[in-house]
Design a protein with these regions (language model features):
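Conserved catalytic core of the tyrosine transesterase superfamily
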Residues: 1-188
Length: 188
């Protein structure tokens, strides 16, 4: 059944050889775990013991082996695809992986520039802007809006010229959740 699934990935879904190999390794680990978990090697994918609890156990087993939550989540994704395939082919009555939730991954905060790094970036941008090229002036304005006004990249990308009020030095931007906000523009 695993061979059929891997052939399906390669031939029908046309996934790369590396991706198919990754799925194969993930399912080999699942097979190893289930043999250990069930206490014997003559189990079948259709056995009722191959259930949601067994798959949750697999995730815990992977975690105890030192794998990151992200890696465990990826292996769960491969497992879900495999069981979805088996269910779609009517080889199992229900998909036990469908009800297994992926582990929450830690959200890393974006890095930031030190004050000195920011100063260096602006100094370089100002030097380039003095060369009177349109691109250099544009880049300086972009930096000023991002850093000085606290715009997000998505807000800057969606910004229209008519959203800038030069008289009051304010910019109207569409923020997260399509909420409009007004931010000040610095002197530069």
């Amino acid at each position: 059944e695993v061979r059929d699934f891997l052939r399906h990935l390669a031939d029908e879904r046309q996934l790369s050889r590396h991706t198919v190999t990754a799925y194969e390794l993930d399912l080999r680990q699942l097979t190893e775990f289930l043999t250990e978990y069930l206490g014997h090697g003559d189990w079948r994918w259709t056995d009722k013991e191959v259930d949601r609890l067994a798959l949750r156990g697999f995730m815990g087993w992977l975690g105890r082996r030192g794998l990151s939550r992200r890696t465990v989540g990826r292996k769960l994704s491969a497992t879900r695809s495999f069981f979805r395939f088996l269910h779609g082919e009517d080889r199992i009555a229900s998909n036990p992986a469908g009800a297994v939730r992926a582990p929450k991954t830690a959200k890393t905060l974006p890095g930031h520039l030190t004050r000195g790094d920011a100063s260096d970036v602006f100094t370089e941008a100002e030097k380039r802007a003095e060369q009177n090229t349109l691109a250099a002036a544009r880049d300086l304005v972009i930096l000023e809006l991002l850093y000085g006004s606290g715009l997000r990249l998505s807000e800057l990308y969606d910004l229209d010229l008519d959203a800038i009020d030069r008289g009051s030095k304010l910019v109207r931007v569409m923020g997260k959740g399509r909420k409009e906000r007004i931010v000040p523009v610095s002197e530069a």
